[in-house]
Protein backbone atom coordinates (compact mmCIF):
# COMPACT_ATOMS: atom_id res chain seq x y z
CA UNK A 1 0.00 0.00 0.00
CA UNK A 2 1.43 3.37 -0.88
CA UNK A 3 0.58 6.88 0.21
CA UNK A 4 -1.35 9.11 -2.14
CA UNK A 5 -1.01 12.85 -2.39
CA UNK A 6 -3.70 14.74 -0.53
CA UNK A 7 -5.94 17.45 -1.94
CA UNK A 8 -4.05 20.75 -1.85
CA UNK A 9 -4.54 24.02 -3.75
CA UNK A 10 -3.32 23.88 -7.34
CA UNK A 11 0.10 25.42 -7.78
CA UNK A 12 0.38 27.64 -10.80
CA UNK A 13 3.21 27.09 -13.24
CA UNK A 14 4.58 30.56 -12.50
CA UNK A 15 4.77 29.87 -8.78
CA UNK A 16 6.52 26.56 -9.37
CA UNK A 17 9.14 28.16 -11.60
CA UNK A 18 9.85 30.99 -9.14
CA UNK A 19 10.40 28.45 -6.39
CA UNK A 20 12.66 26.37 -8.63
CA UNK A 21 14.81 29.33 -9.61
CA UNK A 22 15.48 30.20 -5.97
CA UNK A 23 16.46 26.63 -5.14
CA UNK A 24 18.64 26.01 -8.20
CA UNK A 25 20.93 28.78 -6.95
CA UNK A 26 21.96 26.51 -4.06
CA UNK A 27 22.64 23.52 -6.34
CA UNK A 28 25.60 21.38 -5.40
CA UNK A 29 27.84 21.59 -8.48
CA UNK A 30 28.53 17.85 -8.35
CA UNK A 31 24.86 17.20 -9.11
CA UNK A 32 25.30 16.87 -12.86
CA UNK A 33 22.48 16.22 -15.30
CA UNK A 34 22.89 12.71 -16.73
CA UNK A 35 20.01 11.73 -19.02
CA UNK A 36 16.29 12.05 -19.65
CA UNK A 37 13.52 10.31 -21.55
CA UNK A 38 10.25 11.83 -22.75
CA UNK A 39 7.74 8.99 -22.97
CA UNK A 40 5.72 10.01 -26.02
CA UNK A 41 3.62 6.83 -25.93
CA UNK A 42 1.83 8.14 -22.82
CA UNK A 43 0.63 11.21 -24.67
CA UNK A 44 0.69 14.99 -24.30
CA UNK A 45 -1.55 16.92 -21.92
CA UNK A 46 -3.29 20.18 -22.81
CA UNK A 47 -3.05 23.44 -20.92
CA UNK A 48 -5.84 23.70 -18.37
CA UNK A 49 -6.73 20.01 -18.63
CA UNK A 50 -7.66 17.79 -15.69
CA UNK A 51 -4.32 16.02 -16.08
CA UNK A 52 -2.38 19.27 -15.78
CA UNK A 53 -4.34 20.24 -12.68
CA UNK A 54 -3.58 16.87 -11.10
CA UNK A 55 0.07 17.20 -12.09
CA UNK A 56 0.35 20.62 -10.47
CA UNK A 57 -1.17 19.26 -7.26
CA UNK A 58 1.33 16.40 -7.27
CA UNK A 59 4.29 18.69 -7.90
CA UNK A 60 3.20 21.11 -5.19
CA UNK A 61 3.01 18.24 -2.74
CA UNK A 62 6.43 16.90 -3.71
CA UNK A 63 8.25 20.22 -3.42
CA UNK A 64 6.46 21.98 -0.58
CA UNK A 65 5.12 19.10 1.51
CA UNK A 66 7.63 16.39 0.68
CA UNK A 67 9.49 14.56 3.43
CA UNK A 68 13.07 14.27 2.17
CA UNK A 69 14.44 12.37 5.19
CA UNK A 70 14.30 8.99 3.47
CA UNK A 71 15.08 10.23 -0.04
CA UNK A 72 12.05 8.62 -1.67
CA UNK A 73 8.45 9.48 -2.51
CA UNK A 74 5.82 7.77 -4.62
CA UNK A 75 2.23 8.90 -4.94
CA UNK A 76 -0.71 9.60 -7.22
CA UNK A 77 -3.36 12.24 -7.78
CA UNK A 78 -6.65 12.03 -9.66
CA UNK A 79 -8.87 9.41 -11.21
CA UNK A 80 -8.42 7.42 -14.40
CA UNK A 81 -7.86 8.51 -17.19
CA UNK A 82 -6.22 11.59 -15.64
CA UNK A 83 -4.28 9.94 -12.83
CA UNK A 84 -0.76 11.27 -12.34
CA UNK A 85 1.91 9.11 -10.71
CA UNK A 86 5.00 10.88 -9.39
CA UNK A 87 8.17 9.33 -8.00
CA UNK A 88 11.56 10.54 -6.88
CA UNK A 89 14.52 8.64 -5.46
CA UNK A 90 17.63 10.38 -4.14
CA UNK A 91 21.04 8.77 -3.95
CA UNK A 92 21.70 7.03 -0.65
CA UNK A 93 24.09 9.72 0.60
CA UNK A 94 21.90 12.62 -0.58
CA UNK A 95 18.91 12.90 1.74
CA UNK A 96 17.36 15.87 3.54
CA UNK A 97 18.35 19.24 1.98
CA UNK A 98 20.56 17.65 -0.68
CA UNK A 99 17.63 15.52 -1.80
CA UNK A 100 15.28 18.50 -1.89
CA UNK A 101 17.75 20.49 -3.98
CA UNK A 102 18.22 17.66 -6.46
CA UNK A 103 14.49 16.96 -6.80
CA UNK A 104 13.77 20.65 -7.32
CA UNK A 105 16.45 20.83 -10.01
CA UNK A 106 15.21 17.63 -11.63
CA UNK A 107 11.64 18.92 -11.79
CA UNK A 108 12.80 22.11 -13.47
CA UNK A 109 14.90 20.11 -15.93
CA UNK A 110 12.03 17.77 -16.73
CA UNK A 111 9.67 20.64 -17.52
CA UNK A 112 12.20 22.15 -19.90
CA UNK A 113 13.15 18.93 -21.67
CA UNK A 114 9.73 17.23 -21.82
CA UNK A 115 7.14 20.04 -21.83
CA UNK A 116 3.60 18.68 -21.90
CA UNK A 117 4.58 15.01 -21.71
CA UNK A 118 2.38 12.88 -19.48
CA UNK A 119 5.27 10.47 -18.97
CA UNK A 120 8.91 11.46 -18.50
CA UNK A 121 12.01 10.52 -16.49
CA UNK A 122 15.13 12.52 -15.71
CA UNK A 123 18.34 11.42 -14.01
CA UNK A 124 20.79 13.63 -12.15
CA UNK A 125 23.90 12.56 -10.29
CA UNK A 126 22.09 12.59 -6.95
CA UNK A 127 18.49 11.72 -7.83
CA UNK A 128 15.94 10.68 -10.43
CA UNK A 129 12.44 12.08 -10.95
CA UNK A 130 9.55 10.54 -12.88
CA UNK A 131 6.00 11.47 -13.85
CA UNK A 132 3.77 8.85 -15.44
CA UNK A 133 0.26 7.70 -16.26
CA UNK A 134 1.25 4.14 -15.30
CA UNK A 135 1.31 2.74 -11.77
CA UNK A 136 4.76 1.16 -11.35
CA UNK A 137 4.77 0.71 -7.58
CA UNK A 138 6.58 -2.49 -6.50
CA UNK A 139 7.44 -3.20 -10.17
CA UNK A 140 10.83 -3.29 -11.88
CA UNK A 141 11.13 -1.02 -14.91
CA UNK A 142 13.01 -3.05 -17.53
CA UNK A 143 12.55 -0.51 -20.33
CA UNK A 144 14.41 2.61 -19.25
CA UNK A 145 18.14 2.31 -18.67
CA UNK A 146 21.44 3.71 -19.88
CA UNK A 147 25.10 3.54 -18.95
CA UNK A 148 28.09 5.85 -18.63
CA UNK A 149 31.76 4.89 -18.41
CA UNK A 150 35.21 6.37 -18.02
CA UNK A 151 37.04 6.20 -21.38
CA UNK A 152 40.30 5.26 -19.62
CA UNK A 153 41.18 1.57 -19.25
CA UNK A 154 42.78 -0.26 -16.34
CA UNK A 155 46.03 -2.20 -16.82
CA UNK A 156 44.85 -5.62 -15.61
CA UNK A 157 41.38 -5.91 -17.13
CA UNK A 158 40.49 -9.45 -16.05
CA UNK A 159 41.54 -8.98 -12.41
CA UNK A 160 39.83 -5.60 -12.20
CA UNK A 161 36.57 -6.87 -13.70
CA UNK A 162 36.51 -9.89 -11.41
CA UNK A 163 37.21 -7.98 -8.20
CA UNK A 164 34.89 -5.08 -9.05
CA UNK A 165 32.06 -7.49 -9.83
CA UNK A 166 32.69 -9.25 -6.52
CA UNK A 167 32.46 -5.91 -4.69
CA UNK A 168 29.18 -5.06 -6.41
CA UNK A 169 27.76 -8.47 -5.52
CA UNK A 170 28.82 -7.99 -1.89
CA UNK A 171 27.12 -4.59 -1.80
CA UNK A 172 23.96 -6.11 -3.29
CA UNK A 173 23.84 -8.60 -0.43
CA UNK A 174 24.19 -5.76 2.06
CA UNK A 175 21.63 -3.52 0.33
CA UNK A 176 19.00 -6.26 0.20
CA UNK A 177 19.42 -7.41 3.80
CA UNK A 178 15.98 -7.44 5.45
CA UNK A 179 17.56 -5.99 8.60
CA UNK A 180 18.89 -2.96 6.70
CA UNK A 181 16.12 -0.45 7.48
CA UNK A 182 16.05 3.32 7.97
CA UNK A 183 14.50 5.55 10.64
CA UNK A 184 11.13 5.39 8.88
CA UNK A 185 11.21 1.57 9.07
CA UNK A 186 11.71 1.31 5.30
CA UNK A 187 14.17 -1.00 3.59
CA UNK A 188 17.26 1.05 2.76
CA UNK A 189 18.04 -0.85 -0.48
CA UNK A 190 21.35 1.00 -0.74
CA UNK A 191 24.93 0.11 0.08
CA UNK A 192 28.35 1.62 -0.58
CA UNK A 193 31.84 0.32 -0.03
CA UNK A 194 35.41 0.17 -1.23
CA UNK A 195 38.02 -2.43 -2.08
CA UNK A 196 41.72 -2.41 -2.90
CA UNK A 197 42.61 -4.05 -6.20
CA UNK A 198 46.37 -4.15 -6.64
CA UNK A 199 47.61 -0.59 -6.19
CA UNK A 200 44.17 0.90 -6.84
CA UNK A 201 41.19 1.40 -4.55
CA UNK A 202 37.72 1.01 -6.04
CA UNK A 203 34.73 2.88 -4.57
CA UNK A 204 31.26 1.56 -5.41
CA UNK A 205 27.56 1.77 -4.63
CA UNK A 206 24.32 -0.02 -5.50
CA UNK A 207 20.77 1.21 -4.98
CA UNK A 208 17.13 0.41 -5.70
CA UNK A 209 14.05 2.60 -5.41
CA UNK A 210 12.36 2.13 -2.05
CA UNK A 211 9.07 0.89 -3.47
CA UNK A 212 10.79 -2.43 -4.19
CA UNK A 213 11.26 -5.21 -1.65
CA UNK A 214 14.55 -6.98 -1.05
CA UNK A 215 13.79 -9.79 -3.52
CA UNK A 216 12.82 -7.49 -6.41
CA UNK A 217 15.74 -5.19 -5.62
CA UNK A 218 18.09 -8.14 -5.91
CA UNK A 219 16.48 -9.14 -9.23
CA UNK A 220 16.80 -5.59 -10.55
CA UNK A 221 20.48 -5.35 -9.66
CA UNK A 222 21.17 -8.76 -11.19
CA UNK A 223 19.54 -7.48 -14.38
CA UNK A 224 21.68 -4.35 -14.68
CA UNK A 225 24.84 -6.26 -13.73
CA UNK A 226 24.38 -8.12 -17.01
CA UNK A 227 25.17 -4.82 -18.75
CA UNK A 228 28.57 -4.61 -17.04
CA UNK A 229 30.44 -6.01 -20.04
CA UNK A 230 28.83 -3.47 -22.40
CA UNK A 231 29.33 -0.57 -20.02
CA UNK A 232 32.37 -1.16 -17.98
CA UNK A 233 34.68 -3.90 -19.28
CA UNK A 234 38.15 -2.84 -18.14
CA UNK A 235 37.08 0.76 -17.56
CA UNK A 236 38.36 2.83 -14.65
CA UNK A 237 34.82 3.87 -13.80
CA UNK A 238 31.29 3.11 -14.89
CA UNK A 239 27.64 3.03 -13.99
CA UNK A 240 24.38 1.59 -15.22
CA UNK A 241 21.23 3.48 -14.31
CA UNK A 242 17.64 2.37 -14.62
CA UNK A 243 14.49 3.77 -13.11
CA UNK A 244 14.31 1.02 -10.48
CA UNK A 245 17.98 0.45 -9.65
CA UNK A 246 21.54 1.47 -10.45
CA UNK A 247 25.19 0.79 -9.67
CA UNK A 248 28.37 2.81 -9.93
CA UNK A 249 32.08 2.34 -9.29
CA UNK A 250 35.06 4.70 -9.60
CA UNK A 251 38.74 4.89 -8.68
CA UNK A 252 38.00 7.97 -6.57
CA UNK A 253 35.51 8.74 -3.77
CA UNK A 254 32.25 10.10 -5.19
CA UNK A 255 29.90 9.82 -2.20
CA UNK A 256 29.46 11.84 0.97
CA UNK A 257 30.76 10.14 4.09
From Swiss-Prot:
Q: List the subcellular locations.
A: Secreted
Instruction: Name the major location.
Output: secreted
Q: Which CDD domains match?
A: Gnk2-like
Q: Which Pfam families match?
A: Stress-antifung (PF01657)
Task: Quote the cellular component terms of the Gene Ontology held in the record.
Answer: extracellular region
Which N-terminal residues, if any, form the signal peptide? 1-26
Q: What keywords does the record list, in alphabetical order?
A: Repeat, Secreted, Signal
Q: Which residues form the Gnk2-homologous domain?
A: 32-136, 142-254
Similarity field: Belongs to the cysteine-rich repeat secretory protein family.
Q: What is this protein called?
A: Putative cysteine-rich repeat secretory protein 28
Amino acid sequence: MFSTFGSVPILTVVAIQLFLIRNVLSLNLTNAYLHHKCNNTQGIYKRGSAFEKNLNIALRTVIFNGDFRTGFRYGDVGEDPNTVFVMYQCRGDSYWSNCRTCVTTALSGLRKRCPGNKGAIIWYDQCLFEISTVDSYHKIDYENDFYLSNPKNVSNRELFNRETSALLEKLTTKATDKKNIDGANQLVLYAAGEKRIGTKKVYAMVQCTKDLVFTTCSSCLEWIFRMYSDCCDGKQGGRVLGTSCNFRYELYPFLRN
